[in-house]
A protein has these predicted regions:
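Sec-dependent N-terminal signal peptides
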Residues: 3-13
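Short S/T/G/P-rich N-terminal loop/turn motif that feeds into the first structured element of a domain
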Residues: 18-185
Length: 186
């Protein structure tokens, strides 16, 4: 029985170590506050204009989500944060060029928020077991701050998280995940 367990353990270890880690996508995070006398309704109306111009002019594949903190702490002293994604730094740069271009001037000048902090990150997108159609316009997202253990890499973290996701999917739990690191770590 020990030999069977050892063979099983070796095969499992080989699978974990041989799993390929995909290239990360690029993301920008902007923490924003509503301008005086502006509301979330104003922002949502503005986002329709943003979507129209992006749909007509974007060639970078940029997409964005807006998130609202559920709890307030000194670290979340903002009304919302904008998370924009592109598949590469080049395409994130193209999206930024588009934002500062003439097509976006009217939308840019009418934005009802002021962004007070920003950072760029890389994200490894893990396999989810649901489709966008399964989601409503509002759904919970949890962020967890983690430190790598000594001798471990972001690839190790990806493989570990990927294996945890597979276990939860087999148990019928619908979820998805991203491993996020500030650009200076990658």
């Amino acid at each position: 029985m020990k030999n069977l367990f050892l063979i099983s353990l070796l095969v499992s270890s080989f699978f974990v170590n041989s799993q390929e880690v995909p290239d990360p996508i690029r993301a920008e995070y902007l923490m924003c506050n509503l301008n005086d006398e502006k509301s979330m309704y104003d922002f949502m109306q503005w986002s329709k204009s943003w979507n129209e111009v992006m749909d007509a002019t974007d060639e970078s594949g940029y997409d964005a989500s807006v998130m609202v903190p559920r709890y307030r702490t000194p670290l979340t002293d903002f009304d919302m944060f904008w998370v924009g994604h592109a598949d590469s730094s080049t395409n994130l740069g193209k999206a930024l060029d588009n934002w500062f271009g003439d097509n976006f001037k009217e939308v840019r000048d009418s934005i009802p928020v002021t962004c007070v902090q920003a950072f760029n990150a890389v994200q490894w997108v893990l396999e989810s077991n649901f489709s966008p159609e399964d989601l409503s316009d509002a759904y919970p997202v949890s962020y967890r701050y983690c430190n790598l253990k000594e001798g471990k890499t972001l690839a190790d973290a990806f493989i570990n998280l990927s294996n945890q996701m597979k276990i939860s999917h087999k148990a019928g739990i619908k979820n998805g995940a991203r491993l996020i690191a500030p650009c200076l770590l990658y």
